[in-house]
Amino acid sequence: DEILTINLRLFLTDVNEALVFDPESTELRFCQPDESPTADLMLLDYLNNYFYIEANGNQTPLTIKNKKLKGDGINTALGVTFEHTQRAPLRSLKIKNAVFTDLFYDQTNIIYVHVNGTSTSLMLNKKTPTHTLVF
Protein backbone atom coordinates (compact mmCIF):
# COMPACT_ATOMS: atom_id res chain seq x y z
CA ASP A 1 0.00 0.00 0.00
CA GLU A 2 1.07 3.56 -0.74
CA ILE A 3 -0.28 6.73 0.82
CA LEU A 4 -1.34 9.51 -1.54
CA THR A 5 -0.97 12.81 0.28
CA ILE A 6 -2.62 15.88 -1.19
CA ASN A 7 -1.81 19.32 0.20
CA LEU A 8 -3.77 22.37 -0.90
CA ARG A 9 -2.72 25.89 0.05
CA LEU A 10 -5.53 28.36 -0.40
CA PHE A 11 -5.60 32.05 0.48
CA LEU A 12 -8.16 32.44 3.26
CA THR A 13 -9.72 35.51 1.62
CA ASP A 14 -10.32 33.45 -1.54
CA VAL A 15 -11.81 30.58 0.50
CA ASN A 16 -14.20 33.01 2.19
CA GLU A 17 -15.10 34.60 -1.16
CA ALA A 18 -15.87 31.16 -2.64
CA LEU A 19 -17.85 29.84 0.34
CA VAL A 20 -19.67 32.83 1.86
CA PHE A 21 -19.14 35.45 -0.88
CA ASP A 22 -17.23 37.82 1.44
CA PRO A 23 -13.41 37.74 1.46
CA GLU A 24 -13.29 39.52 4.83
CA SER A 25 -15.78 37.17 6.52
CA THR A 26 -14.97 35.66 9.91
CA GLU A 27 -18.06 33.44 9.81
CA LEU A 28 -16.31 30.09 9.22
CA ARG A 29 -13.32 30.68 11.56
CA PHE A 30 -11.13 27.95 10.03
CA CYS A 31 -8.63 26.43 12.50
CA GLN A 32 -9.95 28.52 15.41
CA PRO A 33 -11.36 27.03 18.64
CA ASP A 34 -14.79 28.33 17.62
CA GLU A 35 -14.60 27.09 14.01
CA SER A 36 -18.06 26.85 12.46
CA PRO A 37 -19.43 23.29 12.59
CA THR A 38 -20.28 23.64 8.88
CA ALA A 39 -16.86 24.93 7.78
CA ASP A 40 -15.41 21.56 6.66
CA LEU A 41 -18.64 20.52 4.92
CA MET A 42 -18.80 23.81 3.01
CA LEU A 43 -15.14 23.53 2.04
CA LEU A 44 -15.50 19.92 0.85
CA ASP A 45 -18.69 20.75 -1.05
CA TYR A 46 -16.84 23.51 -2.91
CA LEU A 47 -13.68 21.47 -3.52
CA ASN A 48 -15.63 18.46 -4.82
CA ASN A 49 -16.91 20.68 -7.63
CA TYR A 50 -13.50 21.99 -8.65
CA PHE A 51 -10.88 19.49 -7.55
CA TYR A 52 -10.32 15.75 -7.84
CA ILE A 53 -7.62 13.12 -8.10
CA GLU A 54 -8.05 9.87 -10.02
CA ALA A 55 -5.51 7.13 -9.30
CA ASN A 56 -5.52 4.36 -11.94
CA GLY A 57 -8.87 5.69 -13.21
CA ASN A 58 -10.58 5.64 -9.80
CA GLN A 59 -11.52 8.90 -8.11
CA THR A 60 -10.05 9.18 -4.63
CA PRO A 61 -12.40 10.36 -1.89
CA LEU A 62 -11.46 13.69 -0.31
CA THR A 63 -11.34 13.34 3.46
CA ILE A 64 -9.62 16.12 5.40
CA LYS A 65 -6.74 14.80 7.51
CA ASN A 66 -5.78 18.19 8.92
CA LYS A 67 -5.91 21.94 8.35
CA LYS A 68 -3.69 24.80 9.44
CA LEU A 69 -3.38 28.53 8.91
CA LYS A 70 -0.11 30.20 7.96
CA GLY A 71 0.69 33.86 7.40
CA ASP A 72 -0.92 37.13 8.44
CA GLY A 73 -3.66 39.44 7.21
CA ILE A 74 -4.52 39.11 3.52
CA ASN A 75 -1.57 36.72 3.11
CA THR A 76 -3.09 34.13 5.46
CA ALA A 77 -3.27 30.75 3.74
CA LEU A 78 -5.38 27.77 4.71
CA GLY A 79 -3.41 24.55 4.30
CA VAL A 80 -5.58 21.47 3.84
CA THR A 81 -4.15 17.94 3.81
CA PHE A 82 -5.93 14.89 2.43
CA GLU A 83 -4.63 11.31 2.54
CA HIS A 84 -5.72 8.26 0.57
CA THR A 85 -4.39 4.70 0.81
CA GLN A 86 -3.51 3.48 -2.67
CA ARG A 87 -3.62 -0.33 -2.70
CA ALA A 88 -2.49 -1.02 -6.30
CA PRO A 89 0.76 0.30 -7.81
CA LEU A 90 0.23 3.77 -9.27
CA ARG A 91 -0.03 3.58 -13.08
CA SER A 92 -1.80 6.88 -13.78
CA LEU A 93 -2.79 10.00 -11.91
CA LYS A 94 -5.39 12.39 -13.27
CA ILE A 95 -5.62 15.72 -11.49
CA LYS A 96 -8.30 18.36 -11.84
CA ASN A 97 -7.68 21.63 -10.07
CA ALA A 98 -10.06 24.38 -11.14
CA VAL A 99 -10.25 25.82 -7.62
CA PHE A 100 -11.17 29.53 -7.69
CA THR A 101 -11.44 29.60 -11.52
CA ASP A 102 -15.12 30.38 -10.92
CA LEU A 103 -14.05 33.54 -9.07
CA PHE A 104 -10.98 34.69 -10.99
CA TYR A 105 -10.77 34.38 -14.77
CA ASP A 106 -6.95 34.28 -14.77
CA GLN A 107 -6.58 31.90 -11.78
CA THR A 108 -3.67 29.48 -12.20
CA ASN A 109 -3.12 26.57 -9.83
CA ILE A 110 0.35 25.11 -9.49
CA ILE A 111 0.55 21.37 -8.80
CA TYR A 112 3.61 19.48 -7.57
CA VAL A 113 3.55 15.70 -7.94
CA HIS A 114 6.21 13.54 -6.28
CA VAL A 115 6.11 9.84 -7.24
CA ASN A 116 8.90 7.28 -6.78
CA GLY A 117 11.58 9.94 -6.39
CA THR A 118 10.51 11.87 -9.50
CA SER A 119 8.94 15.32 -9.25
CA THR A 120 6.67 16.96 -11.79
CA SER A 121 5.05 20.38 -11.69
CA LEU A 122 1.87 21.33 -13.53
CA MET A 123 -0.02 24.57 -14.06
CA LEU A 124 -3.78 24.15 -14.31
CA ASN A 125 -6.30 26.88 -15.09
CA LYS A 126 -9.80 27.55 -16.44
CA LYS A 127 -8.80 26.58 -20.00
CA THR A 128 -6.79 23.50 -18.95
CA PRO A 129 -8.22 22.30 -15.61
CA THR A 130 -7.04 18.66 -15.81
CA HIS A 131 -3.87 16.73 -16.59
CA THR A 132 -3.08 13.01 -16.60
CA LEU A 133 0.32 11.61 -15.67
CA VAL A 134 1.22 8.06 -16.71
CA PHE A 135 3.92 6.12 -14.85
Named regions from a protein language model:
Residues 1-135:
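N-terminal soluble domains immediately following signal/targeting peptides that reside
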